[in-house]
Amino acid sequence: MQAGHEGAGREQSFGVNIHLPFEQQANRFIRNDPKLVAFHFFFTRKLIFVKEADAFVFFPGGFGTQDEAAEVLTLLQTGKTQMVPILMLDLPNNGYWREWDDFVRRRMLGAGYISEEDLSLFKMVENVEEAVKEIQHFYSNYQSLRFVKRDMVVRLVHPPTPSLIAELNRDFRDILTGGEIRETAALPEEADEQAAWSLHRLLVPFNRRNFGRLRNMIDVINGPR
C-alpha cells in the first residue's frame, strides 16, 4: 500500500490500516493523515479498499496477500463488485505468482473447482511498466458498468461501431439471456451518476453468471493493444 500512497501523493491518497498488537504501522506517506482509517476486522478493511479501487496489483506476500487476492477474485467471479483489472506482478527471477498460477490451473481448474473462464479474471505481469500498460488499456474504452433491471449497461469512452456490436453479439451469445447487445442512451435510472452521463453505452442482456467471459468481452471492447 505504501507504493500506492507514494505514487499518488498524500493529497490524493487514503489509507486503510488494521489494528494489530504488532507489525502493522501506517507508512510515512499517509501516517497521521485524517484520511487514514484503522479497522478492527480484516473483512471491513477489505470491503472498503475493494469498493474504492479501480485496479489491483498484487506483489509476492504472505497470508494477508493471499487472503486479499482470493477475496477480490471471488467478488469479481460472483459479480459482487465492479469489473476491474487484477494483475499479479512477479519480481525478477522470483516466480511467486507463476507457481501460484500453476497451482490454480492444476489443482483448482483441474479438479473442477473453478471454470476455464475464471482464469480471465487476472493477468500475470513481469514488471511495473507492463502493469501500467494493462491498467491503461483496460480503461482505454471501457469505463464502468451498471445493472438496470434485467439488463447491464456498459459505459464506453468511444461510440461503439456497428462492426463491434456485431462481433460482440456473435462471439458472446453464450452469456446473453435473450435479445441482442445494442447501443443505448443513458437510462433514467442512471440519473444519480451525472459524471458518467455523457459516456457512450451498450445495453447487454447479460446472464449475471459468466463474469470471466464478461472480462473477455471488455478486452474485445477495448480493442488490440
Identify the role of each PLM range.
Residues A38-L87, Q143:
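Active-site/ligand-binding-proximal alpha/beta "capping" segment
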Residues Q2, N94-R107:
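Glycine-rich, charge-decorated loop segments at or immediately adjacent to ligand/cofactor-binding or catalytic sites
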Residues L20-Q25, T65, N93-W97:
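Short gly/pro/ser/thr-enriched loop/turn and capping motifs at secondary-structure boundaries
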Residues K35-T44, S120-A131:
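Short acidic-hydrophobic, aromatic-tinged amphipathic segments that line or gate anion-handling sites
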Residues T81-N93, D118-S120, V148:
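Short loop-to-beta-strand entry elements in the cores of soluble alpha/beta enzymes
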Residues L121, V128-R225:
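SAM-dependent methyltransferases
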Residues L47-F58, R107-E126:
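Conserved thiamine diphosphate
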Residues M1-F59:
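Acidic/glycine-enriched connector segments
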